[in-house]
């Protein structure tokens, strides 16, 4: 039977290896995972599978939280709370179809049109959230925010970071399009962006 000192050394080495291999969940929860393996009398392959599966689940969770953080969502975006009793808006069947995200996989553009207060921003935010949950990189911003980013990206580090996120996004929702008057150079900037993103 191995001494406590030897076991402690192994745990320390395993933790360091996990950190060096960029397996933060394993490094942080090694004691708990080892204890669970002993309790369940896991085989080596069961233990290894447990380690890797839990690391993978944690990586997926962290990736989701990062995508959600950068998505630019407002406080309310849960499509389950959408009021279908409105006379203007989409019905439940249309909402289910949109939430399936087939339109993203087929690279269709989606245009939400309606009067102020009809829920366009809410629906766009909810669809961004659905896309993030499905593993897509998605981003919501107003047209004004988009133009500030496009016009200042060469001189502003935060604007350049935003621009890079926009360029990597698989779904980009532009809000308040009708509230921002477009000038000639703005139209050209928007056209170039759409060309780059879709090209």
Curated annotation (Swiss-Prot):
Belongs to the IS21/IS1162 putative ATP-binding protein family. The keyword Nucleotide-binding applies. GO terms for molecular function: ATP binding. ATP binds at residues 114-121. The keyword Lyase does not apply. This is Insertion sequence IS21-like putative ATP-binding protein. GO terms for biological process: DNA replication. SUPFAM superfamilies: P-loop containing nucleoside triphosphate hydrolases. The lineage of its organism: Bacteria, Pseudomonadati, Bacteroidota, Bacteroidia, Bacteroidales. InterPro entries: IstB_ATP-bd, P-loop_NTPase, Sigma_54_int_dom_ATP-bd_1. Pfam families: IstB_IS21. Keywords: ATP-binding, Nucleotide-binding, Transposable element.
